[in-house]
Every structure is written in C-alpha cells, then in structure tokens.
C-alpha cells in the first residue's frame, strides 16, 4: 500500500457524511504496497482502512467490493466492505474512486512459519470454493496479453541478459497458460503482506484489487512463490510443502494440476517481475510510495531451473 493522493481532514469529514460511522478522529497514511493510496481511518465508531484507487475505474469497483462481501458471508476471512448510508459500497474521494473496509486484527509477517503457511493455504482453497457461485466476472488484466505488451515497453531499458530471459519465458508461456485447468475467482496477489495473521491463524485476506477469473494453480503458485521465498530468492521446500498441504486439505489437487504447478510458478514470476520492472523504470509520482525490488522474481525464476 502507498499514498499517491493526499486527503485533508476537511475532505475526510465531507466523505464521512455519507456513512454512519460517527465523527472523524484521525487519518494515517500506509506506506507499504505500490498501487493505491491507503490510510488507516479512525472515527468515533472504530478503525477502518480507506483506499483511494489510482488505476481502477469507478465502474470496476463493484466486482471487488461485492466479492469481499460475498466471501465474508461465506465464512472466508476477509476485510468486509463498509456500506454507505445509501447502500453503495463504492464512493468518491478527491475526485477518485474510493472505499472503506473493516480494519482487521492481526498483522502480516515477513518470516512465516510452516503453521502459518499451512493455514494460509487452507484459507486460499476455502476462498476458491466459496467464490464458485459468485455471479460477477472479471478477466485477468495482468496476464499474457498484458505482459507481452509490457515486455515491448521494457526491452529498451533492460540489460541484454534480462531482455533475453524475459522474451524467452513469455514465448514459452504463450501456449501453456493452464486455461484447461480448474478455474474460478482468484486473488492473484496473495503475498505475505496481503494476509493478516493472529498467531498461527489467518485473521484476514486483504487487497483483492487484482482478483479476477483464472486457473487455481496460477493463484496457488503466486502465493507459494512469495510465502516460501527465502531472503536469497529461492524456495524453502518445507514452507512450500506446508502451504500446498494446507490447500489440499480443503481442495485436493488433480494429477494434471500438480504437473502444471512448476509452469504456474514461472508464470507467477513473470507477472511480478514485469510489474516491478514497470514500477522501477516508469515510477508513479506520489507523496509516500514504496517500490519493491524487481530482481527478486527474476532471481526466483532463475532458481527454478
């Protein structure tokens, strides 16, 4: 999360007039993350997370917010959206789309245990199953067409080796995207900083704003690539096993899915290597922003062999 759009106290008071959340107390920017402007909002009725969307359009928000409400009602640990007085889940602040969600207890972790990986994997499988009857649709905006287009933009600024690696991996994935595998609504960004933990248990998944339709192996691979990734950008096999074991305890994988998993891991590496390269070479101006190391997923990709 980051802060690109600054919000004054007076703007917040006007914004809150559309909600039954009491009086404004304070607003604190959240520096982590890279896409939207995020704040902790405190009112006389409690604490919430405010998100001002820098890229998503107003008409796209209902998918993400209704998905969170749907999952919350199905017992998945998520940050439920807060409705306005008029019943809408989305709003406008500083001329941009915005929303409020519940502020969950717990915190993220940079060094997960096997127990935390197991329970996070189980909750991811529960999420996949719970979203099976969700009626709204969203295609993946950051999949093959996106990374192919981004590659063309990035090649002039990359080293010769990185450019060759990126081209080769994207070419290899063209006819191997796993579209034949079980699919549904996926989180598509379930990194460690998007899961709140209370001890060994999951208190909530957050930041669903890349959620879309996709194959479940791709979603699982994205999560494992981060949760089991070590400081030197290799995979800890014990953490990987724990995460997948938790997932399979809720939703067993087919032999075909297991066979595809290594390819899904490579696709996950490409997706986040490309997005971080774009953020690094073409940064978005902001008051309090956080750009992540683009080489982490290149190095993980290389370690996969």
Swiss-Prot record:
Pathway: Amino-acid biosynthesis; L-threonine biosynthesis; L-threonine from L-aspartate: step 4/5. It comes from the Bacteria. It holds the Pfam family APH. InterPro entries: Aminoglycoside_PTrfase, Homoserine_kinase_II, Kinase-like_dom_sf, Pseudomonas-type_ThrB. Its EC number is 2.7.1.39. It catalyses: L-homoserine + ATP = O-phospho-L-homoserine + ADP + H(+). Transmembrane segments: none annotated. The keyword Nucleotide-binding applies. Keywords: Amino-acid biosynthesis, ATP-binding, Kinase, Nucleotide-binding, Threonine biosynthesis, Transferase. GO terms for molecular function: ATP binding; homoserine kinase activity. Belongs to the pseudomonas-type ThrB family. This is Homoserine kinase. It comes from Neisseria meningitidis serogroup A / serotype 4A (strain DSM 15465 / Z2491).
């Amino acid at each position: 999360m980051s802060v690109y759009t600054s919000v004054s106290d007076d703007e917040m008071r006007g914004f809150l007039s559309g909600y039954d959340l009491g009086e404004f107390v304070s607003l604190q920017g959240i520096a982590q993350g890279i896409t939207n402007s995020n704040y902790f909002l405190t009112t006389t009725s409690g604490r919430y997370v405010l998100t001002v969307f820098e890229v998503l359009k107003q008409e796209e928000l209902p998918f993400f917010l209704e998905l969170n409400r749907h999952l919350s009602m199905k017992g998945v640990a998520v940050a439920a959206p807060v409705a306005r007085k008029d019943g809408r889940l989305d709003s406008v602040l500083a001329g941009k789309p915005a929303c409020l969600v519940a502020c969950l207890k717990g915190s993220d972790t940079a060094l997960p245990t096997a127990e935390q990986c197991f329970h996070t994997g189980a909750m991811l499988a529960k999420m996949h199953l719970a979203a099976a009857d969700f009626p709204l649709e969203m295609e993946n905006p950051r999949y093959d067409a996106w990374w192919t287009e981004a590659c063309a933009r990035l090649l002039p600024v990359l080293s010769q080796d990185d450019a060759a690696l990126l081209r080769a991996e994207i070419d290899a994935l063209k006819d191997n995207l796993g579209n034949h595998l079980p699919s549904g609504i996926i989180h598509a960004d379930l990194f460690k900083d998007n899961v709140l933990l209370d001890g060994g248990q999951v208190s909530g998944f957050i930041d669903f704003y890349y959620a879309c339709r996709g194959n479940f192996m791709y979603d699982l691979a994205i999560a494992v690539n981060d949760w089991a990734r070590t400081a030197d950008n290799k995979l800890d096999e014990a953490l990987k096993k724990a995460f997948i074991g938790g997932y399979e305890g809720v939703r067993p994988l087919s032999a075909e899915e297991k066979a595809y998993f290594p390819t899904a891991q490579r696709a996950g590496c490409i997706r986040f290597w490309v997005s971080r390269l774009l953020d690094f070479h073409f940064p978005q101006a902001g008051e309090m922003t956080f750009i992540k190391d683009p080489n982490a997923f290149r190095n993980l990709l290389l370690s996969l062999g």
